[in-house]
């Protein structure tokens, strides 16, 4: 059974990566009300979230409020609560907050024919964990800036084929 977290005022909304380039694990982290929720995600999900938040920020007034850098950084130890599935974004204009909803990805066994029975049975709902958090425009901006740092800290891309170059070398298909 999934959990539902509804945080009206986030103390921190962060992203980061653990591990070496090429083998990093990305996380989102929400800190509010004395609780920390760490969500494993893909690098592309962090990039897309930062991109959409930046687009939304264009329509929000700049409050000029500085955010403590700690609030946009992962707090260790990072203990994964769930794996990110879908993301929803919105704006709470009266309170000048951005609404971010992070939903757990439900993993199913594709080889199990019984999964179709489970999905058709109203008594056996599959509940995912959901985190709904409201962040200030300043917190969203800090998240985007932190995301940029981690996204650009990955492996360099080959100038001929565009694929990432591993520390051990690169067999470029354009030259093989």
Model-found features: residue ranges?
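Hydrophobic, ordered structural segments
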Residues: 34-37, 42-48, 56-58, 105-109, ...
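Short, structured motif recognition centered on aromatic/hydrophobic residues
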Residues: 24-29, 49, 53, 98-100, ...
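Intrinsic, low-complexity N-terminal interaction/targeting segments
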Residues: 1-20, 26, 64-130
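Mixed-charge, glycine-accented linear interaction segment located at domain edges/termini
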Residues: 107-169, 173
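Short glycine-rich, low-complexity/disordered patches
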Residues: 59-77, 154-164
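The feature marks the first
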Residues: 1-59
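Generic structural detector for well-ordered beta-strands
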Residues: 40, 90, 132-134
């Amino acid at each position: 059974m999934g959990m539902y977290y509804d945080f009206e005022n986030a103390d921190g909304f962060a992203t980061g990566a653990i591990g070496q380039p090429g083998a990093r694990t990305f996380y989102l982290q929400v800190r509010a009300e004395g609780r920390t929720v760490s969500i494993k995600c893909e690098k592309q999900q962090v990039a897309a979230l930062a991109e959409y938040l930046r687009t939304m920020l264009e329509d929000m007034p700049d409050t000029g409020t500085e955010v403590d850098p700690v609030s946009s950084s992962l707090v260790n130890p990072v203990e994964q609560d769930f794996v990110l599935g879908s993301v929803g974004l919105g704006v709470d204009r009266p309170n000048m907050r951005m609404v971010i909803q992070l939903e757990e990805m439900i993993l199913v066994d594709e080889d199990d024919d019984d999964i179709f029975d489970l999905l058709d049975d109203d008594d056996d709902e599959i509940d995912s964990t959901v985190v709904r958090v409201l962040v200030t425009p300043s917190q969203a901006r800090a998240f985007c800036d932190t995301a940029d740092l981690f996204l650009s800290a990955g492996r360099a891309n080959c100038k001929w084929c565009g694929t990432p170059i591993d520390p051990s070398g690169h067999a470029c298909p354009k030259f093989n």
